[in-house]
Amino acid sequence: MITRRHLLAVAAPAAVVAGCGGGGERADPAERRRGSDIGFLNSAISLERATIAAYRVGEPLLRPAARRRARQIVEQEQEHLRALVEGVRKLRGEPATPKTAEEYRRGFPRLRDQHDVLRFTADLERLQLRKYGDGLPDLFRPDLRQLAASILAVEAEHLSVLLGIAGRPQTPEAFVTGTS
C-alpha cells in the first residue's frame, strides 16, 4: 500500500513549486494571475516528472503486455510535460527543475512486482486527476484551462488502463474524482 510518506515525497516538491511565483502584495492583478498560472503549471510539471519516473522504475517488473502499455502511457506523459513546460515559458516563467532518477527512486515505495507497480502508478494517476480537476477553475488563461482539461481526460484514461491490467473494473465510478 502506498503510504502518506511516499505520496508526500512525490507531491511535496510540487506543492512547494506551486506556492512560488505568486508575486508580492503590491503586484498588479495581471502579474498575480500570471504567477498563479505559472505556479500551477510548475506543480503539474513536477507531478508529471514523478509519474514518468515511477513508470520507468517499475517497467522491469511489468509483464510484456503491461510493459507495452506503460511505455505508451509514458510517451503521453512526456507530451503533457512538453506542453506544460511550453506553457510556463510562454508566460515568461522558469519551468520547475527536475530531480534525478535516484532522487525519485528514493522517494518511491519499494516495488517488488507488477502488482506494486500498478498500484503505485494508479495512485499517481489519481493524484494527477485531483491536481488537474482541482486546479482547472483557478487557471486564469483559457488556453491553460483547455490544456488542463485535455490532460485530465487522458489521465483518466491512463487510470482506466491500469485498472484493466490489474483486473479491476475500468470504470468503477460514474464520475472521475481522483480518489479511490
Locate the predicted segments by residue.
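All-alpha RGS (Regulator of G-protein Signaling) helical domain and cognate RGS-like helical scaffolds
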Residues: I2, A9-P13, G21-S180
